[in-house]
Regions:
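Cell-envelope/extracellular polymer assembly enzymes that use nucleotide-activated donors
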Residues: 24-27, 57
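Short, acidic, metal-binding catalytic loop of nucleotide-sugar glycosyltransferases
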Residues: 44-55
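A conserved acidic beta->alpha catalytic loop
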Residues: 61-70, 85-87, 116
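Short beta-strand-to-loop acidic/aromatic patch adjacent to the donor-nucleotide binding site
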Residues: 104-116
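N-terminal membrane-anchoring/stem segments of glycan-assembly enzymes
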Residues: 1-22, 73
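A structural helix-start
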Residues: 32-40, 62, 66
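Acidic helix N-cap motif at the loop->helix transition within catalytic regions
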Residues: 40, 66-74, 120
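Long helical/loop segments within the catalytic core of UDP-sugar-dependent glycosyltransferases
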Residues: 82-97, 101, 119-180
Length: 180
């Protein structure tokens, strides 16, 4: 099993898709449970996208973050949805945000609060969704913290999973395993 997908991941690159002719509307959803220390870097990477600003909203779902963090986010061009649950879960936060923001979007993109995205991320995803056969996209996660042995092992594990369980499957025309 692992050998087949490992070898498949080494096959030639997937075909490049032509650029999209229209800009789809994105809701970038960032559930943030006590993520005060990392949320700003994630938000800034979203706001710095090379994509029309009127075609995406960055939605921070603040669950038990500090009032100071919420105040600093409120002055940015983001939609801040504050939630309070007795028992917090990511799915509860996402459902609350979807109810709060409405249906004015073509694509919902979910990021973890410690993710950062490259400046062309939305454009690349928009190009993928221009293909009518594409219904869902799983993007490549890379570790940004490599400063100790455990973090390095986590990064190696992440790359193995990206290669075998996602890229190998995709290059064989199969659905990739979801992560995140």
């Amino acid at each position: 099993y692992l050998l087949v997908y490992s070898l498949a991941s080494r096959r030639r690159d997937l075909p490049m898709l032509p650029p999209a002719k229209e800009h789809k509307r994105f809701a970038i959803l960032i559930p943030a449970y006590r993520e005060d220390a990392v949320i700003h870097e994630c938000v800034h990477s979203c706001l710095e996208q090379d994509y029309p600003a009127d075609c995406f909203d960055t939605v921070v779902i603040s669950d038990r973050m500090q009032p100071e963090t919420n105040a600093s986010l409120a002055v940015l061009p983001v939609r801040l949805v504050e939630v309070h649950f007795e028992k917090s879960t990511k799915s509860k936060s996402l459902n609350a945000a979807m109810a709060a923001i409405g249906n004015d979007y073509d694509i919902a993109l979910v990021l973890d609060a410690d993710n950062v995205i490259p400046y062309d991320y939305l454009s690349d995803i928009n190009d993928l969704f221009a293909n009518p056969e594409v219904e869902i996209v799983q993007t490549h996660r890379s570790a940004k913290n490599l400063n100790n042995d455990m973090a390095l092992l986590d990064a190696i594990s992440e790359e193995i999973n990206n290669t075998i369980f996602r890229l190998g499957h995709a290059k064989l025309g199969l659905s990739a395993a979801l992560i995140g």
